């Protein structure tokens, strides 16, 4: 099953314009839950050397002359047998991948994050953000996320109101973690 899912997303995609924009910025640390290698491809096109971390032992190693670190907390397409994809794997993540939890916690405490294309439904990130909120309360670092606003399009009034309510509740919830949502109308913006 894991191989089938990962084969569906493997290697066929090319980085988007947004990937290229991110790679061109002076960003030294990337965290992703994606298995693909689009960030790495984008960095390579910018002549930047990525130090990719997708296994626990990678965390203790440093690639010389690296331009950026890419943390792939749920694994990499190149090691499909080690990806985090099932509910059981998500549930055991804080124990089996504790060094990733520690590293991400440290970065969330000491660095400002910009979340892009993230649904905030990942239980591992929720676990980490919750622990930081409990420990640091109002002394958390401010983070940001880009969220696409709800479009009326073909939605009925009731559907639109429901989607808008869900979005507003998510934004309110993100505020608990000091994540400010910036609404955009179109991803091209």
Enumerate the predicted regions with their spans:
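Metabolite-binding pocket within alpha/beta catalytic cores that recognizes anionic/polar moieties
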Residues: 1-52, 80-84
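Short gly/ser/thr-rich secondary-structure transition/capping motifs
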Residues: 12-13, 52-56, 94-98
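SIR2/sirtuin-family catalytic core signature
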Residues: 14-25, 45-50, 59-67, 80, ...
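Short beta-strand/turn micro-motifs composed of small residues
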Residues: 32, 74, 147-149
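Active-site metal-binding loops of divalent metal-dependent hydrolases
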Residues: 35, 75, 118
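Aspartyl protease catalytic domain
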Residues: 56, 86-87
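Class I SAM-dependent methyltransferase SAM-binding "motif I" and its flanking Rossmann-like core
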Residues: 64, 69-86
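Active-site glycine-rich loop that binds ribose-phosphate moieties when present
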Residues: 87-102, 128
């Amino acid at each position: 099953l894991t191989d089938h899912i990962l084969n569906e997303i493997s290697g066929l995609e090319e980085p988007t314009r947004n990937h290229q924009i991110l790679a061109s910025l002076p960003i030294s640390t990337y965290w992703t839950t994606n298995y693909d290698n689009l960030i790495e491809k984008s960095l390579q096109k910018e002549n930047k050397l990525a130090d990719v971390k997708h296994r626990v032992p990678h965390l203790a190693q440093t690639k010389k002359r690296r331009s950026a670190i890419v943390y792939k907390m749920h694994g990499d397409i190149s090691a499909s047998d080690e990806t985090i994809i099932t509910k059981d794997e998500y549930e055991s993540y804080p124990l089996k991948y504790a060094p990733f939890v520690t590293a991400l916690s440290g970065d969330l405490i000491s660095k400002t994050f910009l979340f892009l294309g993230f649904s905030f439904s990942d239980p591992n990130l929720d676990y980490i953000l919750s622990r930081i909120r409990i420990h640091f309360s109002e002394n958390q670092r401010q983070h940001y996320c880009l969220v696409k606003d709800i479009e009326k399009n073909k939605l009925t009034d009731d559907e639109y109101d429901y989607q808008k309510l869900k979005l507003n509740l998510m934004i309110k919830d993100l505020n608990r973690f000091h994540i400010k949502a910036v609404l955009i109308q179109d991803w091209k913006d």
